[in-house]
């Protein structure tokens, strides 16, 4: 009997604008329009080329790789305490990050213009691949055990911390990291030595946030593509304080996730798994740390932040109010936040579209409030 996932909605009866394919295509148009606009009006901007190449190759590689994942029986195990509608997703191939993350890294590596840029891209590629492998090991353990849990939280945290410390030691040796945090209106906060624990926290928090966001078809891949695009455009708008090479890297990663989205939109043919979501968070963090874009990442990645905070709040309140019977209060119907709306009766695709729109609005806000000299 086939493990192929069944669509959660009858796409034949849906309005054209509510179909997953249409929503994903419209998101792609927005991202391409942003890259073309940047190239047209910002000096030295070359964002469209890595975006186009990465998107095309990602679509093709995913088309080739999804049947391979299915043949290897890499079917997602759905958590039993999650929304019951998700049980129909059981068997959908996972670990899709293996197919597209390398595409973004390879295309992004071709935008280097000098030796220092090449080494920064190498460091970025290393930390992204390291997190991808950690996520892949976690996914593999889940699949072999037939459960939704792989590595222990402590084990995963230790591996992520070790990888992040190696990256930060590399960046510190090369003097790539500014000890201040750039803010709008020419304001900056001098962090001194504290920039290092902050950078480590960013890696751990951002990768966890993108991982939590990957719970609905197309949610994390769409939001990730938008945030990578926003980071790229703000790097170009910052002129001499920006970084065209890292902007090109961001667009290559945006293209990789946009191409993946064509297969990950509802009804999903493949999931990125921890393999993809942890790599996404690591790449976003690495770019932000190397380019002094922690503030733009905080604003543009607001949906990721909200997803993570919803889990923290839910757990804290439940533990703080737990009575002798072991039952505590819940702020949300279910965490992360996207499940709160889904359990409340909002259609999965509607939740995804609203989160995409929210991310798009936050990206625009981040561009308006970008750091200035």
From Swiss-Prot:
One of its GO terms (molecular function) is phospho-N-acetylmuramoyl-pentapeptide-transferase activity. Its EC number is 2.7.8.13. The chain crosses the membrane at residues 16-36, 46-66, 93-113, 120-140, 157-177, 185-205, 216-236, 242-262, 270-290, 298-318, 350-369. Its cofactor is Mg(2+). It catalyses: UDP-N-acetyl-alpha-D-muramoyl-L-alanyl-gamma-D-glutamyl-meso-2,6-diaminopimeloyl-D-alanyl-D-alanine + di-trans,octa-cis-undecaprenyl phosphate = di-trans,octa-cis-undecaprenyl diphospho-N-acetyl-alpha-D-muramoyl-L-alanyl-D-glutamyl-meso-2,6-diaminopimeloyl-D-alanyl-D-alanine + UMP. Keywords: Cell cycle, Cell division, Cell inner membrane, Cell membrane, Cell shape, Cell wall biogenesis/degradation, Magnesium, Membrane, Metal-binding, Peptidoglycan synthesis, Transferase, Transmembrane, Transmembrane helix. InterPro entries: Glycosyl_transferase_4, PNAcMuramoyl-5peptid_Trfase, PNAcMuramoyl-5peptid_Trfase_CS. Disulfide bonds: none annotated. Catalyzes the initial step of the lipid cycle reactions in the biosynthesis of the cell wall peptidoglycan: transfers peptidoglycan precursor phospho-MurNAc-pentapeptide from UDP-MurNAc-pentapeptide onto the lipid carrier undecaprenyl phosphate, yielding undecaprenyl-pyrophosphoryl-MurNAc-pentapeptide, known as lipid I. Belongs to the glycosyltransferase 4 family. MraY subfamily. This is Phospho-N-acetylmuramoyl-pentapeptide-transferase. The lineage of its organism: Bacteria, Bacillati, Cyanobacteriota, Cyanophyceae, Synechococcales.
């Amino acid at each position: 009997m086939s493990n192929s996932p069944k669509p959660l909605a009858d796409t034949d009866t849906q309005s054209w604008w509510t179909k997953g394919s249409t929503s994903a295509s419209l998101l792609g148009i927005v991202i391409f329009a942003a890259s073309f606009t940047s190239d047209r009006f910002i000096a030295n901007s070359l964002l469209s080329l890595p975006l186009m190449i990465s998107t095309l190759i990602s679509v093709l590689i995913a088309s080739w790789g999804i049947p391979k994942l299915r043949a290897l029986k890499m079917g997602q195990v759905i958590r039993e305490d999650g929304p019951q509608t998700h049980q129909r997703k059981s068997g959908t191939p996972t670990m899709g990050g293996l197919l597209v993350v390398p595409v973004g890294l390879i295309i992004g590596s071709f935008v280097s213009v000098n030796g220092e840029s090449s080494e920064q891209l190498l460091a970025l590629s290393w930390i992204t691949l390291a997190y991808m492998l950690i996520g892949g090991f976690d996914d593999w353990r889940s699949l072999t055990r037939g459960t939704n849990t792989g590595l222990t939280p402590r084990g995963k945290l230790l591996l992520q911390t070790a990888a992040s410390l190696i990256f930060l030691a590399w960046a510190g040796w090369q003097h790539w990291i500014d000890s201040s945090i750039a803010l709008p209106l020419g304001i900056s906060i001098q962090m001194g030595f504290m920039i290092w624990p902050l950078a480590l926290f960013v890696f751990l928090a951002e990768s966890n946030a993108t991982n939590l966001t990957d719970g609905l078809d197309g949610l994390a891949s769409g939001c990730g593509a938008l945030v990578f695009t926003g980071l790229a455009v703000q790097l170009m708008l910052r002129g001499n304080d920006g970084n065209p090479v890292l902007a090109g890297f961001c667009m290559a990663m945006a293209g990789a996730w946009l191409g993946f989205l064509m297969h990950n939109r509802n009804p999903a043919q493949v999931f990125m798994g921890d393999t993809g979501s942890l790599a996404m968070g690591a790449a976003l963090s690495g770019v932000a740390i190397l380019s002094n874009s922690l503030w733009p990442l905080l604003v543009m990645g607001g949906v990721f932040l909200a997803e993570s905070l919803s889990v923290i709040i839910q757990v804290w309140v439940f533990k703080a109010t737990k009575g002798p019977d072991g039952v505590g209060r819940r702020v949300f119907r279910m965490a992360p936040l996207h499940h709160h709306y889904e359990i409340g009766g909002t259609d999965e695709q509607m939740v995804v579209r609203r989160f995409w729109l929210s991310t798009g609005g936050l990206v625009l806000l981040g561009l308006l409030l970008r750091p200035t000299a």
